[in-house]
Amino acid sequence: MIYPITVFGDPLLRQTAKPIDKDYPELAKLVDDMFETMYFSDGVGLAAPQIGLSIRIFVIDATTYADEEPELADFKKAFINPEIIERIGDEWTMNEGCLSLPEIREDVVRPETVRIKYMDENFVEHIETYGGFAARVIQHEYDHLDGIMFIDLLNPLRRRLLKGKLTAITKGKVPTKYRQKLPGKK
């Protein structure tokens, strides 16, 4: 099932998501649906709040970037109840976008490496360290679980310059190939 993408302005995107347990109803289907929604929307990652669920899970498939970073060749994962243990290394800037902020791309500064603890879709715990593009996408999706969007990491002047675009998003005036769930709409 392809979910509509919850876009900027919906209060759910600003909530801290709740952990889930291994008995979460139809977890395998949810993970599959999240990947399907992400692929349909041309995303690299997708967090549950972006499909209207305030739970601590995100999915990433960075395999299409394996030409630039060979270690991404098999990087397709679900992260359940993740916890970033450590952010390390030099900060670096990269242009980011977000399905919940269509047509907005901005340079965002993030640490180059993260150490993360999470459960996979079988509720097996992992503690792993990622760098480069994988670390960036993990941090971006993880932020969604804490109600943070990449525009929050921009300087105040840059954010002010985006006000018109953000207003257009909340009103559904930014066309996308995917269905959008607008603020205040069911």
Regions found by a protein language model. Name each.
Residues M1-Q139, H144-K186:
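Active-site rim/adjacent substrate-binding subdomains
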